Amino acid sequence: MLDREGFRPNVGIILINARNEVFWGKRIGEHSWQFPQGGIKYGETPEQAMYRELHEEVGLLPEHVRIVGRTRDWLRYEVPDKFIRREIRGHYRGQKQIWFLLRMVGRDCDIQLRATEHPEFDAWRWSQYWVPLDAVIEFKREVYQMALSELSRFVQRSHRAPLSPYGRGGPHRERDGRDNRAGGQAGRNDQNTRGQRQPPTLMVTTSTVIVETVITSRPAAQPIDSSNPDDTPSKDSL
C-alpha cells in the first residue's frame, strides 16, 4: 500500500526503560541495528499497527508498555535505489512513518524476540538515548534525528532524570550489567566542575548485548519486491 508519492505508511517505535535508555535491535543475520518498525496494514490505525509490530518484533504486549508520545505528523525517508528492485524504482520511494515513544513498564525478561515464526531481530540491548543517531544506516539517520528530537520533550516531562545536555556525540552510558555505583563518582565530578564550561567528551563503555538463538530458514534481506508491498522479506524494515 503506497501513497500517491510512492511512500509506504509505516510506524516506528522508540522503547525506553526507567533510565531513559532505548531498545536497540540487531537485525537477524546481519550486523546492522535499528529501532522496531513495520508497515501499517489496510484498515489499521497507526496505534494498532504499533502494538502489532511491538509484539511481532519485540514480543511485548500492551500491558508491558505505556504510550508516552507520538510524532505530530508523518516523517519520511527515501530508500536508495540499490535496495529497490529495478522494476518498481519509478513507483516506490521509501517509508512515511508515525513514531511512538513507549515507556517500558514490564521487565526485561518480557522481551521475546522469537514471539513469531519470522523474527526481525536476533539480539538486543539498551543504549543511551542519542546513540542510534550515529549507529543507524545512513539513509535513516535524518528521520531518526527528527523522531528522537521531537519525542525527547516527552522523556524529560515523564521522568525526573533529564536527558544528556550534550545531546549527540556527548557523554553516554550503556548498560554493562552492573549497578549504578558509578553515579556517585560522576556526581562528585559534577560538583568539582560546576560553573566551568566543559567540552563534550566521549565515554567508552561496554554494553550488554542480549542474544537469543533464532533458528530460521529466512534468507538475508533482499531488495524490496512489488509482489506484496505489505509483506516484504525484511518486514518493511527498510
Swiss-Prot record:
Enzyme class, broadest EC rank: hydrolase
InterPro entries (UniProt xref): Nudix_hydrolase (IPR020476), NUDIX_hydrolase-like_dom_sf (IPR015797), NUDIX_hydrolase_CS (IPR020084), NUDIX_hydrolase_dom (IPR000086), RppH (IPR022927)
Stretches the record annotates as Disordered: 161-238
Any Pfam family hit: NUDIX
Family: Belongs to the Nudix hydrolase family. RppH subfamily.
Cofactors: a divalent metal cation
Residue spans of biased composition, Basic and acidic residues class: 171-181
Database matches in Gene3D superfamilies: Nucleoside Triphosphate Pyrophosphohydrolase
Record has Kinase as a keyword: no
Origin species: Ralstonia nicotianae (strain ATCC BAA-1114 / GMI1000) (Ralstonia solanacearum)
EC number: 3.6.1.-
TM segment ranges: none
Function: Accelerates the degradation of transcripts by removing pyrophosphate from the 5'-end of triphosphorylated RNA, leading to a more labile monophosphorylated state that can stimulate subsequent ribonuclease cleavage.
Motif (Nudix box): 38-59
Assigned keywords, A-Z: Hydrolase
Family annotation (SUPFAM superfamilies): Nudix
UniProt GO MF annotations: pyrophosphatase activity
Residue spans of biased composition, Polar residues class: 188-199
Name of this chain's protein: RNA pyrophosphohydrolase
Superkingdom of this protein's organism: Bacteria
Low complexity biased stretches: 204-217
Domain Nudix hydrolase: 6-149
NCBIfam families listed in its UniProt record: PRK00714.1-2, PRK00714.1-4, PRK00714.1-5
